[in-house]
Structure formats: structure tokens, C-alpha cells
Amino acid sequence: MEAPASAQTPHPHEPISFGIDQILNSPDQDSAPAPRGPDGASYLGGPPGGRPGAAYPSLPASFAGLGAPFEDAGSYSVNLSLAPAGVIRVPAHRPLPGAVPPPLPSALPAMPSVPTVSSLGGLNFPWMESSRRFVKDRFTAAAALTPFTVTRRIGHPYQNRTPPKRKKPRTSFSRVQICELEKRFHRQKYLASAERAALAKSLKMTDAQVKTWFQNRRTKWRRQTAEEREAERQQASRLMLQLQHDAFQKSLNDSIQPDPLCLHNSSLFALQNLQPWEEDSSKVPAVTSLV
């Protein structure tokens, strides 16, 4: 008879040192203890109405290693305190050094439906082949031109321009060669191919040098001729203006010969001697009566 009675009697809970009733020193208040796990560790987020010995559902096999460090290291130390206003204060929890789970490469099963970057790299399409070939050719051409590229200077924007190409050195001729070329040019402005070759051979020059020299000399001759003609035209224009001015001044300074007919008529004589450009009218000679 005593065995069934003892079986029906619930097992008393173990005293908890951090229970709310012990913190408040009020054993009369009914407070449910925090749920505990199978190994006696309490859980902070346990159900409020759960049984003391109830445990959370076990993790699947793939997640078994994820919770092992936490179970081995024990539970967090929970210290619940009730403020005078009735608010439960939960301090910040710091996990133990051994409670941080190590990285598990095989803990989560890979999802075959989601393609990864490595799997996309193995795919080949016709347009991808042409793009790769084009990029490869461009990189090859850039690598081939790298040794010949000119480095740009750092400084003012106008100084960052690529320097111009180096010009070829100017060919210098001797005085004897220049003298012979000038003599031939004064006699003949244009040379035939055979004449040019013979002249180049006699002066120990190349055919291209003789041809280039004659082209430059003709250009210089045309420019000089145009300048000389312009100077002659301006000189002739100045000479004509000077002659016109002298003739006009001579016509003004020459005295007017009186007409014999006007000598016997005072009115006609006065009109003949009238000079409107004269400012001083006193210079007009007086009319004398010849009657």
C-alpha cells in the first residue's frame, strides 16, 4: 500500500539559488521555476507553463554537432532580478570560450537546385566562346604593345599630353653640293628622272635627296617671287600717287594767263580771276578799267 502512495506523490523540486522567490525573500508567492533540460541546465526561453523535466526536441543528425559545444560547456548563468516596478531585468549573457561552435562544412546539406559560381564556370555556350576569344585577343595585343607605350607625365593637364613623335634629323649638305644645286636650279627649275639621277650621282647624293631639295627650292622661289611682285606693285602705286599730287600742286601754283577777250570786259576779267579756293579775298587783283 505504501508503494503506490509514494508513486503518486510528486517528486519535490530541487531548491534554486537564483529563483525569483528567493531573490525577493517571499516564499509565499507562487513562482514557476525556469524550465530545465535533461542535464539539469535551465533554459532562458523555456515555456512558462512547461514541466520541470521537459526537454526541447532533439536536433537532427546534421545539426548534432552544432549544439554539442553548448551542451558540453553548460548553460548560461541566468540571473533574473525583479525591479521595484515589476520589470524583470535579464543581464547580458556572455558565452564561454568553448561554447562558440566551430565551422561545420558538412553540417548543412548543399542545395543542388541553387547554382554556384564554380558550377557556372564549367558551363560553355557558343557566345561565351566568342567573347573569351575576343577578350584574349585584346589582352594579347595590349601585352604586345606594352613595351612600346609612352609613359604619361604627372603634373599640369597640359603637361599630361603624349609627347610628339621624334622628327627625323635634317639632312645637311656641303657647300659644294648646295652651290651646284643652286646653279642647276637657276638654269632649270624642273628636272626629268634621268637628269635628276645623273645630278645625284655626280654630287654623291640619293635621288630622293635631290628630288626633295628641288621641291623645297621651288616652294621658296614661288614665295620669293610673290613677295617681290607685291613689293613692286606697292612701289608703283606709291609712285602714281606722288605724280598725281605733284601735278595737282603744279596746277594750283601756276598763274592764270588772262584771256585777251576778257581784257576789254571788266566783268569777264573778274570772273576769270575769281578763285573760290582762296580764303583771302584781298589777294584778288583789282579790276582796272581800260576804257
From Swiss-Prot:
The answer on whether this UniProt entry bears the keyword DNA-binding reads yes
Which example biological process does GO assign this protein? central nervous system development
Keywords for this protein: Developmental protein, DNA-binding, Homeobox, Nucleus
Q: State the GO CC annotations.
A: nucleoplasm; nucleus
Q: Which Gene3D superfamilies match?
A: Homeodomain-like
DNA-binding residues per UniProt?
A: 166-225
Name the Pfam families on file.
Answer: Homeodomain
Top-level taxon of the source organism? Eukaryota
Return the SMART domains for the record: HOX
The entry's localization annotation reads: Nucleus
Q: Where is this region: Disordered?
A: 1-51
GO terms for molecular function, please?
DNA-binding transcription factor activity, RNA polymerase II-specific; sequence-specific double-stranded DNA binding
What this protein is called in its record is T-cell leukemia homeobox protein 3
Species name for this entry?
Answer: Mus musculus (Mouse)
Q: What is the lineage of its organism?
A: Eukaryota, Metazoa, Chordata, Craniata, Vertebrata
Gene name of the encoded protein: Tlx3
